[in-house]
Amino acid sequence: MADNARAKRLADLIREVVAQKLQRGIKDPRLGSQVTITDTRVTGDLREATVFYTVYGDDEERAAAAAGLESAKGVLRSAVGAAAGVKFTPTLTFVADALPDTAKTIEDLLDKARASDAKVREVSAGAQFAGDADPYRKPESDDESDTAAKTDGDAAE
């Protein structure tokens, strides 16, 4: 079993080789400039590699890019094998990265929360407390502070 540093180096190499090959080496129109390799993970035995990608476009373009990656899997694996120089070239599995969709969902939720906060701020702009500003805090009188100072002074002696 390989160490984690070697698996990370191989994952980085696979990401770079696949990205370069997609840009320059593969003539499939489904794999145009809209496909981006976001991450690569390699198993501990260096036999399986999962390549995460994003596609900028609608669902049809995503499906076309997935089909294009599946058809180019052998060419990409050969390029990785030539560049890596390992005994066994990892089997490539392409997975659409859910990160952009998740980020968009989070951004939508944050925008909704900001709008709700702004609405609450508008409503409470001229509002006042129902009672005193802080009903649990009692003003300290001079008599109490003098007696506290005397008891502190008595304790010091």
Curated annotation (Swiss-Prot):
Annotated stretches, region: Disordered: 124-157
Gene3D superfamilies assigned to the protein according to its UniProt record, in alphabetical order: 3.30.300.20
Main localization of the protein described in the UniProt heading: cytoplasm
Residue ranges, compositional bias (Basic and acidic residues): 147-157
Any single Gene Ontology cellular-component annotation: cytosol
Stated role: One of several proteins that assist in the late maturation steps of the functional core of the 30S ribosomal subunit. Associates with free 30S ribosomal subunits (but not with 30S subunits that are part of 70S ribosomes or polysomes). Required for efficient processing of 16S rRNA. May interact with the 5'-terminal helix region of 16S rRNA.
The protein's name: Ribosome-binding factor A
Taxonomic path: Bacteria, Bacillati, Actinomycetota, Actinomycetes, Kitasatosporales
